[in-house]
Amino acid sequence: LVEDCALTFGSKYKSIIVGNYGDAAIFSTDHTKPLNTLIGGFVYTNDIDIATSIRAMRDDCGDLSNEHQRLILKTYIDEHRIETVNHKIYIMRNYKKALMNKLHIHNEISPYLELETSAKIAINPYYSYPAKLPSVLAKIGLHVLEQYKANIHQRQSWLKEILQVVEKKEDMPAAYYDTGCDIIPLRIAYSTHFALTVFSYIDDWIWFKTPIVATKENICDFGYHWGGCPVAEKIGKSIMNLPVIIDSKQQNIFLRNIKKTYSYGI
């Protein structure tokens, strides 16, 4: 049993931290995740045999070229600087990237390792895949982890305030009210009511709408059969990102808008 814990990182169920229920746990750290190293991830296990096998697989992986690593670092810095300073510039940057992709104006090397998104197995000539996580990204990951630790209490208090505003349990899944769940909110499941509230004043930046993402191909081409992962299919339509990094001023604005909308009975 392998747990995918990237979006439940640090949360507990019945006092056990997620990632300890199965034989191993995976935590991707791409730029959609709370621990953002742009690309990459890590594996956690208490099973010595599994750990030994994974290390052997890692040692057999190639390294990304110096050019590719520099491109990844530059992209990480650009995204972090633009997103935290001016959201409008960040959005315009994404539009520009989308247009260039549409016109097929782009570099052969992508920092996101996007050539592995096809159902057709092929070895690309531009980089090793899978590849070892560059040391610079591991260093960034350690720094981000420290930031994340300092942010946990704020996130939990934020969720508590949201639930106090919503009040009625039918607006949120029962798990948010379960005392056996110690949730560090990174995504939030919403009802239609909550969706109308939040999406009325912020961009709805939703990820993972289907069980297989980050591909332009039909997911059935990967061997997926609809109904095979009913939970993933259901919650994919009702999950919204909460900002990974948010200051108290932004948090107050978020809560104020929710309170305002609910007071009108929308």
Name these PLM-found stretches.
Residues 52, 193-200, 248-254:
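Short, conserved charged micro-motifs
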Residues 239-249:
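Proline-centric
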Residues 3, 8-10:
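Catalytic P-loop NTPase motifs of RecA-like helicase/translocase cores
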Residues 64-71, 161, 174-179, 195-240, ...:
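Conserved PLP cofactor-binding pocket of PLP-dependent enzymes
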